[in-house]
UniProtKB/Swiss-Prot annotation:
Pfam families: Bowman-Birk_leg. The record marks 16-17 as: Reactive bond for trypsin. Belongs to the Bowman-Birk serine protease inhibitor family. Signal peptide: none annotated. This is Bowman-Birk type proteinase inhibitor 1. One of its GO terms (molecular function) is serine-type endopeptidase inhibitor activity. The keyword Disulfide bond applies. Dimer. It comes from Lathyrus sativus. One of its GO terms (cellular component) is extracellular region. Disulfide bonds join 9-24, 12-51, 14-22, 31-38, 40-48.
Length: 53
């Protein structure tokens, strides 16, 4: 389905770098199986939000 756009990790953390980098803190320390990469939002504080195949 279209879950890939929202699928991410159990816990996502954004670094304080500029631009912020999304770090996946998962049981397996990887992103969701449907997801190759996550990005941080431009909000403050940044949040891991989007996932891409």
């Amino acid at each position: 389905g279209d879950d890939v756009k929202s699928a991410c990790c159990d816990t996502c953390l954004c670094t304080k770098s500029n631009p912020p980098i999304c770090r996946c803190v998962d049981i397996r320390e990887t992103c969701h199986s449907a997801c190759n990469s996550c990005v941080c939002t431009a909000s403050i504080p940044p949040q891991c939000r989007f996932c891409y195949k």
